[in-house]
Amino acid sequence: MLKKQFRLKKSSAFNATYRVKHSYCVSGVVLWVGSKKKPEYKQSATKVGFVVSKKTHKRSVKRNRLKRLMRESYRLLLKDGKIEGAQQFISLIFVGYEKALDKNFSQTKEIIAKLLLNLEKNND
């Protein structure tokens, strides 16, 4: 589980991230990117949110499974130090769609890694 300091929780924070309108999509998962951190806040943690809409699947078990897979994938990539490019942003939101529901853990981890790699490439 992600530590509290890394979690995006307030709806106002989610709305602020969506308002920036920068997104990347890979295999049914969309990454919404908030604005870049100001130089004085470079040491603060990047907040991350994981969303799967009720429109994606009516069963909460399926939705929560996808959120758990995305969350754990991000946590492991964070632990391995493979997401330095993402640390320059205030917030990130991963949104799962129907296409991603049937993916296993390794496929989900690969998708999250690709999204973060795209983010790093496009913001250098």
Regions found by a protein language model. Give the residues of each.
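Positively charged, solvent-exposed patches that mediate nucleic-acid binding
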Residues: M1-D124
